[in-house]
């Protein structure tokens, strides 16, 4: 399970600065999907060998009243569901009453917490940070987030004990940067392994779109409502099921509910819980409310799924009972706002009455099969060559970019690794052209496809050829001639 790191602290202590620095390495993954809305409070990061979710909680002013206000509820929920809390303070401003109040709340929750004294650049850090020991939360870690000082060490301190306890293997940087080149036998074995496993299906969507109703309809039984009790809010509910001879695991992000102050049962919406479900799923089923159309929150959830590279199916729920004019307007909006994910199947359903629900699984299986289909190196290289024949790569400094061969780099999502010369100079427009070419050629449906480009090793790079004696004499004569012309 991917760990969650929550950034907690009063305003203006540098939470957003640290968040941006931690998540910067992941921005490129979203850049391939123009029109996508990014949520600046939640992100995926990779640093010091660990992949993790980082949350900028915000919204806590540190006062007792503020801690209890409704505005802080989402921030407090993020703290509850985080695995590690980084309590950020301002070393320049010193210890404040707000810091003391936040520390008191964190102590009461018994969360794994690390005190971070930020903005230590240009001051006597040891003296400035000494008073933060009085918070009673253990060692104080010094950091200058704006410059990146202390960030890597902090993540190592925070995540290593958690990872060891959970059995999470630490990855080397090279394992993330360089995709593996499968042999034909390894590719076939990996594809068979994935095909034999149950399909993990995460049902996600904003509150009240009908996730629970759809889950009950799929399972054919009414689920027992689960109320919040200690230990029940952390993870989604995993429900095994079998349909037409194929095994599934439904990841129910709507399984945990709570009572509001007026004793109404309302769905508890947790972005963190949704993020974890998406990370663990093979296929994501995004539910959209037909009566509300495509909301910004829908695009944010869609971004999580695309960021994780998951296969995707979209279901527009509550389709029954609305007139044709509204249906036409919704379809037009879907074409306009979701045109950048034309690879995903869209279904119009009624979870309450069961209309169209059966056809969802046809697209779910199709998406998973596309995401785990094995393609040989020779086939990928042939498609790559055909794309070059149809549209040549551009010239870079007078030399044309040369693509040599392609191979499988991974499954779910399917990753194609392309080797060549000057591939780092390829414009994004040509990369998108190649991605669409591979998608059409492979008939990939329901899953994003990722292209990774690797430079061919140049044996003469960073090497200078030693001149012969005659070449050295000619060089000296030429330099002497140039010098004489300048003096004249």
Curated annotation (Swiss-Prot):
Has the keyword Zinc been applied to this entry? no
Domain KH-like: residue ranges: 373-457
Q: Name one GO molecular function term.
A: ribosome binding
Where is the region Disordered?
469-488
User: Which residues fall in a compositionally biased region of kind Basic residues?
Assistant: 473-488
Q: Where does GTP 2 bind?
A: 205-212, 252-256, 317-320
Residues reported to bind GTP 1: 9-16, 56-60, 118-121
Q: Which GO terms describe its biological process?
A: ribosome biogenesis
Q: Which family does it belong to?
A: Belongs to the TRAFAC class TrmE-Era-EngA-EngB-Septin-like GTPase superfamily. EngA (Der) GTPase family.
- Matching PANTHER family: GTPASE DER
Q: What is the protein's name according to its record?
A: GTPase Der
Source lineage: Bacteria, Pseudomonadati, Pseudomonadota, Gammaproteobacteria, Alteromonadales
């Amino acid at each position: 399970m991917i760990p969650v790191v929550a950034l907690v602290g009063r305003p203006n202590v540098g939470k957003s600065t640290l968040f941006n620095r931690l998540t910067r390495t992941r921005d490129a993954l979203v850049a391939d999907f123009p029109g996508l809305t990014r949520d600046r409070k939640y992100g995926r990061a990779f640093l010091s060998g660990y992949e993790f979710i980082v949350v900028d909680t915000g919204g806590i002013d540190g006062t007792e009243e503020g801690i209890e206000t409704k505005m802080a509820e989402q921030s407090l929920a993020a703290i509850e569901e985080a695995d590690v809390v980084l309590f950020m303070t301002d070393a320049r401003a010193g210890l404040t009453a707000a810091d003391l109040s936040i520390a008191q709340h964190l102590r009461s929750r018994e969360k794994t917490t690390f005190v971070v004294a930020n903005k230590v650049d240009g001051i006597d850090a040891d003296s400035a940070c000494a008073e933060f020991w009085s918070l009673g939360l253990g060692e104080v870690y010094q950091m200058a987030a704006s410059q990146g000082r202390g960030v890597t060490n902090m993540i190592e301190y925070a995540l290593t004990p958690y990872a060891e306890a959970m059995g999470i293997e630490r990855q080397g940087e090279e394992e993330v940067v360089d995709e593996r080149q499968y042999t034909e036998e390894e590719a076939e074995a990996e594809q068979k392994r994935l095909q034999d496993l149950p399909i993990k299906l995460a049902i996600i969507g904003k509150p009240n779109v009908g996730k629970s109703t759809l889950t009950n309809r799929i399972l054919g039984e009414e689920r027992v409502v689960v109320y919040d009790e200690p230990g029940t809010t952390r993870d989604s509910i995993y429900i095994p099921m079998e349909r037409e001879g194929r095994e599934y695991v439904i990841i129910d992000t709507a399984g945990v509910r709570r009572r509001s102050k007026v004793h109404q049962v309302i769905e508890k919406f947790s972005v963190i819980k949704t993020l974890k479900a998406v990370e663990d799923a093979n296929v994501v089923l995004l539910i959209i409310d037909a009566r509300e159309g495509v909301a910004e929150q829908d695009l944010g959830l869609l971004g999580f799924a695309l960021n994780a590279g998951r296969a995707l199916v979209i279901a527009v729920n509550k389709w029954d009972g609305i007139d044709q004019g509204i249906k036409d307007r919704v379809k037009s909006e879907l074409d306009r706002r979701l045109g950048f994910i034309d690879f995903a199947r869209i279904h119009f359903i009624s979870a309450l009455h069961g209309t169209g629900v059966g056809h969802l699984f046809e697209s779910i299986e199709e998406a998973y099969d596309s995401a785990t289909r094995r393609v040989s190196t020779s086939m990928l290289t042939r498609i790559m060559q055909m794309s070059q024949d149809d549209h040549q790569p551009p010239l870079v400094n007078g030399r044309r970019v040369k693509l040599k061969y392609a191979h499988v780099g991974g499954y779910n999502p399917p990753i194609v690794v392309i080797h060549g010369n000057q591939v780092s100079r390829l414009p994004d427009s040509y990369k998108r052209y190649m991605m669409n070419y591979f998608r059409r050629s492979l008939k990939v449906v329901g899953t994003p496809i990722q292209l990774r480009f690797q430079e061919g090793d140049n044996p003469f790079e960073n090497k200078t050829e030693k001149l012969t004696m005659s070449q050295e004499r000619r060089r000296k004569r030429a330099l002497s001639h140039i010098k004489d012309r300048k003096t004249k």
